[in-house]
A protein has these predicted regions:
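HDAC/HDAC-like amidohydrolase catalytic core signature
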Residues: 1-148
């Protein structure tokens, strides 16, 4: 029997204030729950690498991607994202967007795969929005198309 591919990285969690709407540990909480289940033995866990700038530019503008690399978002940028900026958020964003892509590639090869840290699809080409730095669905689709 083939194992179900699960994409996850331990750096997905981010620090947020205690009463913030976004639960900064939700990804590790879910992964820990999955690990506690007997069916976890049927999972094959893979970890994504950080997304490259070249691949990010297929879904986002150079000026916006540079702001993330340089950690130079304006107060207005951060207001749209609605998350406190941290290096952990930056690193998580580069990992999670590639995690969605990796899960999609695995699903194409094996019929199904899951990404524990996906769903960052509210970001726009020029700015982040709604808890999302990058748009993982646009990134994944555009990179899959580009790579055939």
């Amino acid at each position: 029997m083939n194992k179900l591919n699960i994409t996850y990285h331990p750096e997905y969690d981010i620090p947020v204030p205690p009463k913030h709407r976004f639960v900064g540990t939700k990804f590790s909480d879910l992964f820990s729950y999955l690990q506690s289940q007997t069916y976890f033995l049927k999972f094959q866990v893979t970890q994504p690498q950080r997304a490259s700038k070249e691949r990010l530019l297929r879904a986002h503008s150079l000026s916006y991607v540079d702001k993330i690399y340089e950690e130079s978002l304006s107060d207005n940028d951060l207001k749209k994202i609605n998350l406190p900026w941290s290096t952990q958020l930056r690193n998580r964003s580069f990992l999670a967007i590639e995690g969605t892509y990796q899960a999609a590639k695995l699903a194409l090869n094996y019929g199904i795969a899951c990404h524990v840290g996906g769903g960052t699809h509210h970001a726009h080409h020029e700015y982040g929005f709604g808890f999302c730095i990058f748009n993982d669905l646009a990134y994944t689709a555009l990179n899959l198309i580009e790579e055939g």
